Regions:
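Beta-strand-rich interaction surfaces with strong enrichment in secreted/lumenal proteins
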Residues: 62-63, 90, 130, 171-177
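Intrinsically disordered, low-complexity Ser/Thr/Gly-rich stretches
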Residues: 144-146, 156-160, 167-178, 187, ...
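Mid-length scaffold segments of soluble, non-membrane domains
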Residues: 26, 32-35, 124-166
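Surface-exposed beta-loop interaction hotspot
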Residues: 61, 65-123
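Forkhead-associated
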Residues: 2-65
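Extended, aromatic/histidine-rich regions of cofactor-dependent oxidoreductases associated
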Residues: 92, 162-164, 183-185, 189-227
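A short, sequence-level motif marking secondary-structure junctions
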Residues: 24-26, 47-52, 68-71, 143-151, ...
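Short strand-coil-strand connectors
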Residues: 42, 59, 134-138, 158, ...
Length: 227
């Protein structure tokens, strides 16, 4: 589940009288309080920044706070949920060295791009540079987002397979460092589905216009087929 918090008190629990109804939960689980960009539960801070948050466990439920732009939400997971029970793995395209490509990194210092997520919300994100590569003699570019380190990048991309064999909202790809010649390896064999391929309660970023490629990339994960 995904529940957007309002400023102040937000009641949670299994009863319909709560602001947010949790499945298989006690009638009342208390109040989640949003105040001054911090979130409190049972008089304790459970969120103060993206790297300082708590995961609350209550029977089969696990929940925590996420922030998207200036909005806060409860992300709820049920370890006994139907989505997990129905999950039977993900199909992949056969690995193909054609789709392990060296890309030229073109820095774009100070550039910000507008990201729209699957819920329709938008926010600004730093774009450290462009990744330029060739396939069958044609040149393509992808806007790179920040990765785990300053030399890693995170890419959200779409391609022509989104209409057939891969998830319609695009896929994710991580890069790891620079090659000795200064290039960056794009290994599309490692392209993977975003969380929103599996659940309607995710807030995945969608590919920017620049990152909607016209070519088909039959590599990496196929559509999970569960959502």
């Amino acid at each position: 589940g995904l529940f957007w918090l309002k400023e102040g008190e937000n009641t949670i629990g299994g009863a319909e009288s709560n602001d947010f109804v949790f499945p298989h939960a006690e009638a009342s689980l208390g109040k989640v309080i949003l105040k001054n960009n911090q979130v409190f539960y049972n008089n304790e801070v459970i969120y103060s920044s993206d790297d300082k948050f708590s995961v609350i466990s209550q029977q089969s439920l696990r929940w925590f706070i996420i922030k998207r732009g200036d909005k806060f939400a409860i992300r709820l997971r049920d370890l006994e949920g139907e989505y997990l029970k129905a999950f039977h793995g993900i199909d992949h395209f056969p690995a193909d060295s054609k789709w392990k490509i060296k890309a030229k990194f073109i820095p774009t210092v100070g550039k910000k791009v507008t990201i729209i997520d699957i819920t329709g919300r938008s926010y600004q994100e730093d774009s450290p540079g462009l990744l330029e590569f060739q396939v069958d003699g044609k040149t393509y570019r992808l806007e790179a987002g920040p990765g785990e380190t300053k030399e890693d990048f995170f890419v959200v991309f779409g391609d022509a397979t989104n209409k057939t064999s891969t998830y319609g909202g695009g896929r994710f790809l991580d890069t790891k460092g620079f090659n000795p010649d200064g290039t960056v390896t794009l290994d599309f064999n490692k392209a993977y589905n975003p969380p929103c391929a599996f659940t309607p309660f995710a807030t995945c970023p969608l590919p920017t216009k620049e990152n909607k490629l016209t070519l088909a990339i039959p590599a990496g994960e196929k559509n999970a087929g569960h959502h």
